[in-house]
Amino acid sequence: MKRRGFLRLLLGGAAAGALGPWRGEALGATDFRRVRPADAGWPGANAWKALGQQLRGGLARVDSPLAAGPVSPELLKQMENPYFVGDQAWATQSSGWGGAWSSKPSAWAVSARTAEDVAAAVTFARKNRIRLVVKGGGHSYQGTSNAPDSLLVWTRPMDRIVLHDAFTPQGCAGKVGPVPAVSVGAGALWLHTYDAVTTRGGRYVQGGGCATVGVAGLIQSGGFGSFSKRFGMAAASLLEADVVTADGKIRTVNACTDPDLFWALKGGGGGTFGVVTRLTLRTHALPETFGAVLLNIQADSDAGYRRLIERFVAFYKTALFNPQWGEQVRFGPRNRLGIQMLFEGLDKAKAEEIWRPFLAEVEKPDSGLRIEPGRAVVSFPARAFWNPEFLTTKMKDHVRSDPRPGAPANNVWWASNQEELCIWWHGYESTWMPESLLADARQKDLAAALFAASRHWSLSLHFNKGLAGSPPEAIAAARETATNPAVLGAFALAIIAGGETARYAGVAGHSPDETEGRSDAQAIGAAMAELRKLVPDPGSYVSESNYFEKDWQRAFWGNNYARLRRIKKKYDRDGLFFVHHGVGSEDWSADGMARLRS
């Protein structure tokens, strides 16, 4: 199924030095600096050897073959495989962002296999004043899973998945009843987790849509998947987590034990409050069916396209604005409407019945609209949706498989995500669209804004990433997360973004096009400006947002930020954990190496 890969995405601001209104201090004013490998305070060989001897996993220097001179065609081919990329300590799923960051490996990496390995790495970094980086799936668009001159805590080997028929969080006996759940190591990926929970276990767990996204990072950012309109945010399903905090302590946190830290892990941002080593998530009863409606509609004029957008907005409000429908619709600059909607709990006949009134209008001889070849309505048993055998046989045109000899059979990914692999971002922005825009009196304003934005750049509405229209219990659970409360009243998340696939800074013949990047950034910014006229004070989803967002504290967390800031000071007063635009990052230089004086 096509996912967010098919759109061309965004950028609103272009000042690489924009650090936000909460950071007004001079960058040179500091009372603490971390050390780099060339500094006298950097640990010597014996210190690194001693660290390695503490580990059940491994410790190694990290070098990128992309920086070692001419890059072989064989390596570039391997980089087309997200599982290969994820298996390299030096690599990240995005390669950089123009004017912001480029992927650079850490100096050393701890390949963690246990929470004790993580604790040893955290303690070593704290005592030696070393910049610490955490990477599981490595999907951060903001570059938070890589940094030069750092120690990487690489959790990828921690990928164990265990199903529970009845799970009670530690210390919660007698306070909450046992529920079906799944415990997942911090290095597990979502496709593997779905395969275990749904294919083999016959249950559903709310996770992300991209197969190779890491479970831990998604939960800590809030997290949405194709069926979040029904089951809510991924973070809202968190029952318990094991986390190593800055003091090196391994904590088991839940609503009964360290509830403030537990809350912060549910959407407060990854790599900020500690290193998560294990998560336990509530599982849900599996719907009977999943399915999709896929089609593209071409309008023969601007006026016809505006009418088409108006019709779709009205149709969405009356027929699709409910828990059964998720995913997205794309509005293109060439008067093309791309529909990639997923549903749950319906058969094919019912899905076709729901869409029949809208399509009847589109297919009228005088409509000025044309449905392109390839229209499809499909429905299948939900238990098959992440079954590798089903995907690679019945949906082989929509998926790709890991071609490496001996690769696990469930190393599968959506083909439409291919263009995001090793992407060099020109920009990315998002904004939650409030439900009030669907009111009859506002629908024409919404349609006009979508049309105006599409004149500059393609944009998508991700209906599964707004919780308005969800069941009350899903909204109530999301209210107990740290994510910006704007999500609760939003019917969709609008995304505008773009970049170049398989581009690598400094690699001859494969470097990003800076001129194209600047042009794209301007167009993306202009498109978002059209939506800002309609939604002047929106929230933004932390994982899919503008690197240069100035008011990031409010945009990502709204009025939850003050509480997150207090929790950060409680568990990481010295700021060991730093990520770009993470909670508390306003106290540091842009590279996280120097603390700023308040």
Segments predicted by a language model, with ranges:
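Soluble FAD-dependent oxygen oxidases
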Residues: 2-598
